[in-house]
Amino acid sequence: MKNNNRLKINLPGFELKNPIMPASGCFGFGKEFSELYDLSRLGAIIIKAATKNEKFGNPTPRVAETSSGMLNAIGLQNPGVDHIINHELKELEKYDVPIIANVAGDDIDDYVYVAKRISQAKNVVALELNISCPNVKNGGIQFGTDCNVAYNLTKKVKKVSSKPVYVKLSPNVSDIVGMAKAIEEAKADGLSLINTLIGMALDPKSGKPILANKTGGLSGPAIKPVAIRMIYQVSQAVNIPIIGMGGISNVQDVIDFISAGASAVAIGTANFINPYICVEIIDQLESKLDELNVNHIWDLKGRSYR
């Protein structure tokens, strides 16, 4: 039986027409992709990170290809939250698609400022806190590697945000479940995982790091097994929804992430290889459900442990 709502997903604060969205940092603000297809077809868009002030990013080279993936050390280059609200978000108002705003900062005050400002934008339905940023006031340690720091950050942002808050977890921790539980305790509305793994690539001739920053975030198919494992663990430990990401490049990957416990997924690096990847997967999802003999995509959620 044909059911037009087979892909619809309800998350705290908003509804998705399908569970597919581009991940932050791999889609910019959608401008280039809007020339290829109607952005309203997407479940949502997670826009590029917003910071309090304009950031010019790290020195080049900032990207390096690796086996089954890529490294990036972009450095959160963006025009600043005020510009994003007044220009990029305004431009996205013409599309019927929920916007999730990725929020970053050098310290807790920065996060609070950006979250308060950008949550007021009318087409922003939720925030995604990028807690993989280095805490400048705490020796550069990532917010997302200390449960207490992540708890406090989440709690403070929740107080000022008028929209649901999702926290993007770093995989570069020894206890991802402990981190997820701390963030749930701070009243986060949801989680997104995983962010990139820290990696390095060397120039074969000089033997020196290719990236000017030396290390970068590893993404792409190489990290999918890590993402699946972490989502499998976290989804059984918390009662808030997960947006899954990390190495998705085809429709079967989407099924795997939802089977592991994700409620929706975000596609990152694959957009660089095939800019149509999100809509192609959306087009293939219903056939995949037929193949698996299930009526609604939600029926697959968490089947790996049910």
From Swiss-Prot:
Cofactor dependency: FMN
Mind naming one GO cellular-component term on file for this protein?
A: cytoplasm
Record: residues binding substrate: 48, 72-76, 130, 195-196
Gene3D superfamilies tied to this protein: Aldolase class I
Query: Per its record, what are the GO molecular function terms?
Result: dihydroorotate dehydrogenase (NAD+) activity
This entry's comment on the bound cofactor is:
Binds 1 FMN per subunit.
Show the Pfam families listed in the entry. Answer: DHO_dh
Q: What keywords would UniProt list here?
A: Cytoplasm, Flavoprotein, FMN, NAD, Oxidoreductase, Pyrimidine biosynthesis
Can you state which reaction this protein catalyses?
(S)-dihydroorotate + NAD(+) = orotate + NADH + H(+)
Q: Which InterPro entries match?
A: Aldolase_TIM, DHO_dehydrogenase, DHOD_1B, Dihydroorotate_DH_1, Dihydroorotate_DH_1_2, Dihydroorotate_DH_cat, Dihydroorotate_DH_CS, Dihydroorotate_DH_I
Record's subcellular location: Cytoplasm
Q: Which amino acid positions bind FMN, per UniProt? A: 24, 48-49, 102, 130, 168, 194, 220, 246-247, 268-269
Gene Ontology biological process terms in this record: 'de novo' pyrimidine nucleobase biosynthetic process; 'de novo' UMP biosynthetic process
User: Active site located where?
Assistant: 133
- Signal peptide feature range: none
Pathway note: Pyrimidine metabolism; UMP biosynthesis via de novo pathway; orotate from (S)-dihydroorotate (NAD(+) route): step 1/1
Give a short account of what the protein does: Catalyzes the conversion of dihydroorotate to orotate with NAD(+) as electron acceptor.
- Complex formation: Heterotetramer of 2 PyrK and 2 PyrD type B subunits.
Identification of the protein by name: Dihydroorotate dehydrogenase B (NAD(+)), catalytic subunit
